[in-house]
Structure formats: structure tokens, C-alpha cells
């Protein structure tokens, strides 16, 4: 029998989501696994829209397409899945965004070790009682069952054999595959071990999946053992948090619930008091807020295609569910700020990209609110004729022309007890698809299509740029003004393919060269060079003359641009070497940009580089520059290069023979870019910024050479302007700004306190206007010029003065000159609540008369509206309704 988790391990088990994640990664790091940062939600695999599983970044390694980053690895991978989007919020465990904790073995340990560690982690680190655990194995995997039974000690009755559909993993119809074993948590172990049904979602939740990749499946379905067997595992962070935090669903864990509470506060509702429909809306908002924040952080923008459409759909679902809760003002930015605050610890990139995230949320929400307003007007016109059904054509027009979601049309129609012709909608949708398909046939080739068309017919371009900056070449193909052509004339925008070129084509993070092509009375200004496979494409404009396929031209690189790019590229190599020396020898490159006037280097690192470390790095690099190291460049076999210690980038594909750039004693890297001959040519190096771009990925931006002087001059000018403005010497500026900040902070606090006191003071004069209704004190009054928090304070103060029988309703315009914003607050005493009147429910109904809604707690609630002209009538209705509802004796 498996040993029970010790009481000490259970007592000290991690509980917060942050601790659960860190405990997993530390557990496997202590067992020789390299900690890998989460990859982007935008995968490198072009066949996959979004990162949907923890193993996806390692798929090329599992398939033998890339070398392994280490024998063992562990990660917490950001994932997005939208295939079950309609179940989000309705079930306990469906999400769009989630984190998958994983440990991976690439030809290293296998089944027994994976099982033993999974059990040790679950019972000893997480402190789960083995009596709460059940495991599943593939029906034919006798080895896994034997390990669970004889090595780990699990009761045979709690080892369940499952079919291939549940417990056999495959990357596709052919290729690596193997059985898997899953660990389930049993919420009701008291029901016993007989007749266990793992499909009982109320009793069991699967939280850890172990995949044993041990076979290769051929086209005929035959399985043969793999030479190198792999382990791929996944543990849902949110699921483990639900188990350890002992909450009824994933949404009520500390990974999501703070966002649900933020949304509830915006809607002035109490999550615990809501019905299932209201709770579902809050869960959708909480879940989707995490998803959209991470998607935008990783570079997705809202659109009608691909990832952009997924983002747009999620954003619009958040807005729609907010409206269902009575939130009728823009609130995505507020939810975005809450999500950033919640995620920033594990995903610092959201802080660095905060401005981008919030701007995209604001822009897309504003666009959708305009859409909703237009669509609601049209829908109101349709409903005004009191139809029994909204036709499919009408619903499709709302969807296609106004972007009005079908589900929102259904919800509004349902409120009016009207149906929507869904079959007719599908017919209209299919007709539109067919029209789009027919139209697509006649669309002209895009520029990229044209480039790929002409480049696809050409052999690889011979690159001469390592040894020469000008070279005679023959024009092989032309794209003129976006279309393939055989000739070009002055003024034309062109893409030119040459048989050979000294121009460096953009690649390896380095931008393409600039320069010119010239011939007899012909000049082409080249402003960029890209690559289409191995063909170099020179883009620019015809400055003079005529150019034709077959012409000979002199290709000349802009020497100044090349020198600056070379200096920045070599400086990037020195930067990586310095990071390894100062911060961590295990630091690996995650990306880079080498431009003419700046450089950027992204690298795997779990924490920010400190100011002291940045200073050390700068000093080290400038020292190497001053030492005037001569670079050595040579080609060699990939295995020989790696054996010599050359640094390669994980995920990059390399040929059998590679180019090695060596700064002797400092840096050795596989690199196809251009470099200085001697480090002294770089001149100077200066770091200008360090930031986080994603979980576990940091970025350093820097300048080198003449750009350093330009940067320092610019900074000096800023310091001079600040000194003039503050009438201070440069050394005094920081102290002056700090003092001003403290003064501003103190003034803000004093102003807020004064406003709150003023609101309570204004309200104090209203207490005398209360009227007796039986044993109750009824007060309904107007108080303009006070914001929501102040109005709540005033209402609560009045209720306290009037006692347990107080029924207080205060309404007003925060800005008396703006009729577009109304605030209503209700504060009820204990006796009023005992009389079955609740502030939250009551004020929401009154606010509808002002074109709004809201709610809150039984004793205190706030609502809003958009029609200030209706406020007097709404307050009169509140007075009469309360007077009628309060018991008279």
C-alpha cells in the first residue's frame, strides 16, 4: 500500500498558485531538469494557431527535427484553447487561458522514474493523501500498472485500465507515440474503491498526465520501439490550485478569483449572492481577462482573421457578459489593469507591455460599443414590429454588417420571448462564404505572392558580401509595382533578384543592407534586402533609366550602414558573453535585432538584471572593445563547432557545415551575420534599457559606436532641460522630483479626505428630511457634485444616523453639467433587510429608469445610469415603492 503523505508535508504543502508553480519547477530542477521559460502563445509551428499544450515548444525535439536543449527540462507553459469556449464559466474546469506545468525527458529517464517522481511530488511536496488518488493506465501497458502497484504501492482497485482514446498519445497518424498514465484526485474517497468510474466529473479530476513516447507508428499502423524514448508530462496549474486550496472550482482559486471580484465590484454585485447565470458571466470575464491580456502581451492584435479573431471574440464576450451584469460603461481597461496586477509576478512581460495591452483593450472596446449601439438600434426597430421570430436574414445582417454577435441577438430576443431563425442564419452565412470564395479567385497577386512566384523559379543567390561590398551581378528576375515583370523604368518600385550579391539579406536578427544597383544610365536605390528561402530579394526604387532581366549591374553596399550593422552585431555577441559571465552561464538567446543604429538582445532569465549587473556588463564589454581582439571566422562541421564550445541558439536549424565567429577568449558563436574585424572598431557600447518581454525572457537594448555619442548628447539635453525647469543642478534633480512627488501624494490624500468629509457634511443636513413609515425611517434625496465613493459614504452615514430602520436612497449627477452620468446609492438598515428588502436588488430596478443598472450587497449598493433627465422621476419612484413596501406596523 502506498505510504500516506506525512502530516508535516501536508501542513507545509504549497497553497497559493505562485507557490504551487514554483514547487513543481524546483522539484524537477533539483532532479537535474533545466528550467525553461514559457514560450510565446504564438507558436513557431505554422500549422498551429496558438500554443495549446506544454509540450508544443518541444515538439520538434520529440519529432527529431531539432537537437534537445538538455537531457531533462521543466517548464510552466502559457496555453490558450478556445475549442470549448461555450463551456467556460459553465463547468468547474474549462478555461481559455491556463498554465501547464511539465517535466520532459529527451532520451534520458523513462517510465519508472517518471511515475515515481510524479507520485513523490503529489504526495510529499503537495501533501495529497494517497487515499485521494486514483491512477489510469493504457489497457495494454502492463509495465505501467506493475510500477504503480509494486514499486509505488497503489492499491490495484485504484489502478484503472483505459482504452486508446483516453490513454494513448500520438503526434499524428504516423510518427512518435506511446501510452500514457494519468493521476486523478478523488473528492469522495469515502464511496470506496469498487466500481470506480473516472468519467464521474463530480468525484474525479485528472490533474497530472504522463506520456511515455516509446513507439514509432508507420503508415500501416505498425508500432516499433523508438531508439530514444521520451517523457512528456502535463499538470494543470489551475486544477492543482483547486485541489490544494479546497475550493469548489478552478475559478475560485487565487489564480482567477481576484479578477472575478474585480468584475463583481464594477457591477456592484455580490458573487456569493448571484444566481448561476450571473456567476457564469463573472467567471467568463475573469477567465477571458487573463487570456486577452496574455494574447496582447505576446503580440496579437484584434482583427477578423486567425489569432486576431480569437482575441476579438474573447474581448467582445467580456463586454457582452459585463452588460448582462449591468456594466454599461467601458471597463476592459480596468479589468486589464487587474489582470496585469495578478499576472505580473509569474509573467513580468505584462508589466513591460502594459501600455500596449491597455491601449488595445480601450481601442477594441470602443469599437465594439459603437457596433453594439448601431446594432441595438436596428434590432430595436425589428422588435418594434412585434414579430414572433427574427428572420435568419435579419440576424445575419446584424452579424455581417454591424458585427453584432448572433448570441447577443438571441439573448435580447429571448428577453422579448422571441426566437431567432438559426437555420436561416446558417443559410445566409453559407451564401456569404460562397460569394467570398468566388471573389477570391479574381483577386490579384499580393506583393509577397509576386516575390515568392519569381523567387521560386530562381536558384540560390551567391552571397559575396563577406569579402566585398561591390560586385558585378546579373538581373535574374523583377517585380515591378507589385507584379512580376521583365523591365522597369524610373519611378517604379522594384524588387530585384540577382545571380550574386554583396548585399546581406535580412536574417539571424540582422537587418538587410542598403545601397544601390547601377549600370549604364541606370540607378536603383536599394533600401532593404530580404530572403525568400535562399534567394535574396533587393527592394527599392528606380531612380534613373531602364532596367531589364538579363542586364548587368554593379551592386554596391552602403559602407556606412554596413559598418554600423557589423559593429552592433559583434557587440551583440559580446553582450551574450558578458551576460553569461556576470549573470548566469546558462543564459540562452531567445531572439535579437541588429539594426544600423541600435541592437536588441532577448534572453532566457527568470529575474530582471540588476542595475549593478548592467553596470558590470557595460564595463566588461567596453574593456573587451578596448583590448582590440581580432575576430576569427571559419567554417566547420556542426559537431566540431559544438565540441569547440560554440554557442548555438535553441530552436534554430543549422546545416551540417556552419560558420563560426570567434572573439578569442571571449565569445564563440554559430553565426551567418557580418562582423567587425577587430573589437576596437566598435568604439563604445552603452545599455539603454532592460525589460521583460514574456515569462522568463528579458530584453536588453543598447547602442554602439557613433550611436553612443548621439544617445549621450540626447540624454544630456534632457538633463539640461530638467535643470532649467527645476532651477537645479544635475545632481539635485532627483531630490527635487522626489520631493514634488511626495508633496503631490500628500495633496491628493488631503483632497480625497476633504471631498469625503464634504459629502458627509452635505448629507448631514438631509437627515432631518427623513419621514417615518411605521417603525422605519425613509429618506430619498438628491445630492449632485459627488462621485460614487463619496455618495456611498454619505448614504452610509445617513443610514447610521437613522438607525436599523433606515431606508436611504441618494441619487445625483457627479458633474451637474453632464446629464450623461447618474449615480444612485441605497443603504438599508438591519430591520429593512429583515423585512425582505435588499439594497442591491432594489437600486438596480430604480437605475433602469435612468437607462442603467447595477446592484450590490443587501445593506449597501450602487447603480448607474445614462439619462440624467430621468433622475427626478427615478427618485420619486424609489420613494413611492419603498413607502409601499415597508411594513406599516
Curated annotation (Swiss-Prot):
Cofactor binding note of this UniProt entry: Binds 1 zinc ion per subunit.
GO terms classed as biological process: alanyl-tRNA aminoacylation
Reactions catalysed, as given in the entry: tRNA(Ala) + L-alanine + ATP = L-alanyl-tRNA(Ala) + AMP + diphosphate
Major localization listed first in the record, in broad terms: cytoplasm
InterPro entries: aa-tRNA-synth_II/BPL/LPL, Ala-tRNA-lgiase_IIc, Ala-tRNA-ligase_IIc_anticod-bd, Ala-tRNA-synth_IIc_core, Ala-tRNA-synth_IIc_N, Ala-tRNA_ligase, Ala_tRNA_ligase_euk/bac, DHHA1_dom
SMART domains cross-referenced by the UniProt entry: tRNA_SAD (SM00863)
Binding-site positions, Zn(2+): 569, 573, 671, 675
Gene Ontology MF terms in the entry: alanine-tRNA ligase activity; aminoacyl-tRNA deacylase activity; ATP binding; tRNA binding; zinc ion binding
Keywords: Aminoacyl-tRNA synthetase, ATP-binding, Cytoplasm, Ligase, Metal-binding, Nucleotide-binding, Protein biosynthesis, RNA-binding, tRNA-binding, Zinc
One Pfam family named in its UniProt record: tRNA-synt_2c
Cofactor(s) annotated in UniProt: Zn(2+)
Family annotation (PANTHER family): ALANINE--TRNA LIGASE, CYTOPLASMIC, ALANYL-TRNA SYNTHETASE
Name of protein: Alanine--tRNA ligase
Native source organism of the sequence: Parasynechococcus marenigrum (strain WH8102)
Amino acid at each position: 500500500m502506498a505510504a500516506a503523505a506525512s502530516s508535516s508535508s501536508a501542513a507545509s504543502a504549497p497553497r497559493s498558485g505562485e507557490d504551487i508553480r514554483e514547487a513543481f519547477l524546483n522539484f524537477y530542477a533539483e532532479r537535474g531538469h533545466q528550467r525553461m521559460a514559457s514560450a510565446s502563445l504564438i507558436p513557431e509551428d505554422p500549422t498551429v494557431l496558438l500554443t495549446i499544450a506544454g509540450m508544443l515548444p518541444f515538439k520538434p525535439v520529440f519529432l527529431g527535427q531539432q537537437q534537445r536543449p538538455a537531457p531533462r527540462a521543466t517548464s510552466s507553459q502559457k496555453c490558450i484553447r478556445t475549442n470549448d469556449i461555450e463551456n467556460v464559466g459553465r463547468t468547474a474546469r474549462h478555461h481559455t487561458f491556463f498554465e501547464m506545468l511539465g517535466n520532459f525527458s529527451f532520451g534520458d529517464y523513462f517510465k519508472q522514474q517518471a511515475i515515481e517522481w510524479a507520485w513523490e511530488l503529489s504526495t510529499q511536496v503537495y501533501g495529497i493523501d494517497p487515499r485521494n488518488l486514483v491512477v489510469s493506465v493504457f489497457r495494454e501497458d502492463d509495465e505501467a500498472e506493475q510500477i504503480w502497484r509494486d514499486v509505488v504501492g497503489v492499491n490495484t482497485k485504484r489502478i484503472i485500465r483505459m482504452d486508446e482514446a483516453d490513454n494513448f498519445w500520438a503526434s499524428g497518424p504516423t510518427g512518435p507515440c506511446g501510452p500514457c498514465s494519468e493521476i486523478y484526485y478523488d473528492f469522495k474517497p469515502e464511496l470506496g474503491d469498487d466500481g470506480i468510474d473516472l468519467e464521474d466529473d463530480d468525484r474525479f479530476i485528472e490533474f497530472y498526465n504522463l506520456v511515455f513516447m516509446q513507439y514509432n507508428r508507420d503508415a500501416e499502423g505498425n508500432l516499433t520501439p523508438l531508439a530514444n524514448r521520451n517523457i512528456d508530462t502535463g499538470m494543470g496549474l489551475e486544477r492543482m490550485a483547486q485541489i490544494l486550496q479546497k475550493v469548489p472550482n478552478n475559478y475560485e482559486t487565487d489564480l482567477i478569483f481576484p479578477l472575478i471580484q474585480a468584475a463583481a465590484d464594477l457591477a456592484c454585485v455580490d458573487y456569493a449572492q448571484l444566481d448561476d447565470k450571473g456567476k457564469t458571466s463573472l467567471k467568463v470575464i475573469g477567465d477571458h481577462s487573463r487570456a486577452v491580456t496574455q494574447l496582447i502581451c505576446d503580440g496579437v492584435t484584434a482583427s477578423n482573421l486567425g489569432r486576431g479573431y480569437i482575441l476579438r471574440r474573447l474581448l467582445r464576450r467580456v463586454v457582452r457578459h459585463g452588460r448582462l451584469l449591468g456594466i454599461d460603461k467601458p471597463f476592459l481597461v480596468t479589468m486589464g489593469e487587474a489582470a496585469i496586477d495578478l499576472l505580473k509576478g509569474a509573467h513580468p512581460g505584462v508589466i513591460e507591455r502594459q501600455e500596449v495591452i491597455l491601449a488595445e483593450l480601450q481601442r477594441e472596446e470602443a469599437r465594439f460599443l459603437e457596433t453594439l449601439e448601431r446594432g441595438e438600434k436596428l434590432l430595436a426597430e425589428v422588435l418594434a414590429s412585434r414579430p414572433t421570430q427574427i428572420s435568419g436574414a435579419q440576424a445575419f445582417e446584424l452579424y455581417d454588417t454591424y458585427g453584432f454577435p448572433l448570441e447577443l441577438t438571441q439573448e435580447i430576443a429571448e428577453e422579448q420571448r422571441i426566437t431567432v431563425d438559426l437555420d436561416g442564419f446558417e443559410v445566409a452565412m453559407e451564401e456569404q462564404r460562397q460569394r467570398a470564395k468566388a471573389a477570391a479567385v479574381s483577386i490579384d497577386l499580393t506583393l509577397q505572392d509576386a516575390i515568392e512566384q519569381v523567387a521560386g523559379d530562381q536558384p540560390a543567390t551567391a552571397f559575396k558580401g563577406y569579402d566585398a561590398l561591390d560586385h558585378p551581378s546579373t538581373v535574374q528576375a523583377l517585380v515591378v509595382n507589385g507584379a512580376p515583370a521583365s523591365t522597369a523604368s524610373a519611378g517604379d518600385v522594384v524588387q530585384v533578384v540577382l545571380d550574386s550579391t554583396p548585399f546581406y539579406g535580412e536574417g539571424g536578427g540582422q537587418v538587410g543592407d542598403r545601397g544601390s544597383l547601377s549600370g549604364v544610365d541606370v540607378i536603383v536605390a536599394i533600401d532593404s534586402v530580404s530572403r525568400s528561402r535562399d534567394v535574396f530579394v533587393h527592394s527599392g526604387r528606380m531612380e534613373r533609366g531602364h532596367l531589364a532581366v538579363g542586364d548587368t549591374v554593379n551592386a554596391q553596399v552602403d559602407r556606412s550602414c554596413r559598418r554600423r550593422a557589423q559593429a552592433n552585431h559583434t557587440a551583440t555577441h559580446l553582450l551574450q558573453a558578458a551576460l553569461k559571465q556576470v549573470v548566469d552561464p546558462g543564459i540562452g538567446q531567445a531572439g535579437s535585432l541588429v539594426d544600423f543604429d541600435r541592437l536588441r538582445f532577448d534572453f532566457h532569465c527568470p529575474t530582471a538584471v540588476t542595475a549593478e549587473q548592467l553596470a558590470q556588463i557595460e564595463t566588461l564589454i567596453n574593456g573587451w572593445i578596448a583590448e582590440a581582439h581580432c575576430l576569427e571566422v571559419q567554417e566547420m562541421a556542426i559537431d566540431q563547432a559544438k565540441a569547440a564550445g560554440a554557442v548555438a541558439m535553441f530552436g534554430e536549424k543549422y546545416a551540417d557545415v556552419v560558420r563560426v565567429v570567434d572573439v578569442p577568449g571571449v565569445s564563440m558563436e554559430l553565426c551567418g551575420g557580418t562582423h567587425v574585424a577587430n573589437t576596437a572598431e566598435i568604439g563604445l557600447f552603452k545599455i539603454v534599457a532592460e525589460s521583460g518581454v514574456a515569462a522568463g525572457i528579458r530584453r536588453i537594448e543598447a547602442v554602439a559606436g557613433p550611436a553612443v555619442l548621439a544617445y549621450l548628447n540626447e540624454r544630456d539635453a534632457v538633463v539640461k532641460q530638467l535643470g532649467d525647469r527645476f532651477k537645479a543642478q544635475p545632481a539635485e534633480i532627483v531630490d527635487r522630483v522626489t520631493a514634488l512627488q511626495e508633496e503631490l501624494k500628500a495633496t491628493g490624500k488631503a483632497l480625497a479626505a476633504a471631498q469625503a468629509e464634504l459629502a458627509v457634511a452635505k448629507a448631514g443636513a438631509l437627515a432631518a428630511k427623513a419621514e417615518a413609515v411605521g417603525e422605519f425611517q425613509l429618506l430619498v434625496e438628491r445630492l449632485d457634485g459627488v462621485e460614487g465613493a463619496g455618495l456611498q459614504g454619505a448614504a452610509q452615514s445617513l443610514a447610521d444616523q437613522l438607525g436599523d430602520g433606515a431606508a436611504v436612497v441618494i441619487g445625483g449627477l457627479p458633474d451637474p453639467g453632464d446629464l450623461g452620468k447618474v449615480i444612485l446609492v441605497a443603504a438599508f438598515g438591519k430591520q429593512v433587510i429583515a423585512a425582505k428588502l435588499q439594497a442591491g436588488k432594489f437600486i438596480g430596478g430604480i437605475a433602469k429608469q435612468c437607462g442603467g443598472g447595477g446592484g450590490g450587497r443587501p445593506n449597501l449598493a450602487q447603480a448607474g445610469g445614462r439619462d440624467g433627465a430621468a433622475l427626478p422621476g427615478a427618485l420619486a419612484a424609489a420613494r413611492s415603492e419603498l413607502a409601499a413596501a415597508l411594513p406599516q406596523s
